[in-house]
């Protein structure tokens, strides 16, 4: 009788291929003594190059992707700043409730928003630590219609509750008025365009909404 050859069992874990995602380096310009604001710009937002190149002399524009590394950003900030007045985030509203920030991880998880949480996911902890460590007074989310998303409102409230930071966010389209948006943070009724940008921002011909995306 022909002898059956038994299959060799291999631990499935040994067969798993680990996916290496190459970190996308942060893009930024010379850091001067006049800088007191940070503007983080997602490189997938429409016309991100104009947003990046139009920052004013008080603002350090940093272009990132969701594959960028938190450690690189915290090292950059720690090596160059003791305090930061305010920080802004510019990204589009595509897949807004599963929006990734750095290290290919979400801005926040559903668990972060549960009552009584004291331990948070990596990017929530990261933002909270930056606010506390650099004594940031204002944080602005320059994305379309953030205030219309209940989970984002809860996230904004979490940041305020944990740190006392003033959160700027919008309930309409964000961008230049002539193209259907504005730069007003409805939570504070503050127009932030001149806080972060110089007059070259007038060349931004779209809004930070995914359905208007074009480069």
What spans do the regions from the language model cover?
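Small-residue-enriched, tightly packed secondary-structure blocks
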Residues: 38-41, 45, 51, 60-70, ...
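Caspase-like cysteine protease fold
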Residues: 169-213
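Short, intrinsically disordered N-terminal pre-domain segments
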Residues: 1-10
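Short, solvent-exposed mixed-charge patches
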Residues: 1-2, 213-215
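Short, flexible loop/turn elements at secondary-structure junctions
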Residues: 43, 143-145, 189
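Solvent-exposed loop and beta-edge segments used for protein-protein assembly and interaction
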Residues: 31-33, 81-83, 133-135
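A domain-level signal for caspase-like cysteine endopeptidase catalytic cores
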Residues: 13, 17, 21-76, 155
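Catalytic cores of nucleophile-dependent amide-cleaving enzymes
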Residues: 85-86, 92-178
């Amino acid at each position: 009788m022909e002898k059956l050859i038994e299959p060799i069992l291999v631990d499935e874990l040994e067969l798993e291929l680990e996916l290496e995602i190459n970190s996308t380096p942060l893009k930024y310009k010379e850091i001067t003594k006049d800088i007191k604001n940070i503007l983080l710009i997602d490189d997938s937002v429409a016309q991100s190059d104009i947003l990046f190149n139009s920052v004013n002399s008080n603002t350090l524009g940093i272009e990132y992707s969701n594959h960028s590394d938190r450690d690189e950003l915290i090292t950059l900030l720690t090596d160059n700043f003791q305090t930061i007045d305010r920080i802004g985030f510019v990204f589009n509203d595509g897949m807004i409730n599963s929006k990734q920030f750095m290290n290919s991880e979400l801005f926040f998880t559903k668990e972060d928003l549960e009552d009584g949480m004291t331990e948070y996911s990596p990017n929530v902890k990261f933002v909270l630590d930056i606010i506390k460590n650099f004594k940031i007074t204002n944080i602005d989310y320059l994305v379309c219609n953030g205030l219309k998303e209940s989970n984002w409102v809860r996230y904004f409230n979490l940041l305020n509750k944990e740190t006392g930071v003033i959160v700027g966010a919008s309930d309409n389209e964000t961008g230049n008025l002539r193209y259907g948006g504005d730069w007003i943070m409805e939570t504070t009724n503050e127009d932030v365009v001149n806080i972060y940008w110089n007059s070259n921002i007038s060349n931004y011909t779209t809004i930070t909404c995914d359905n208007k995306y074009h480069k």
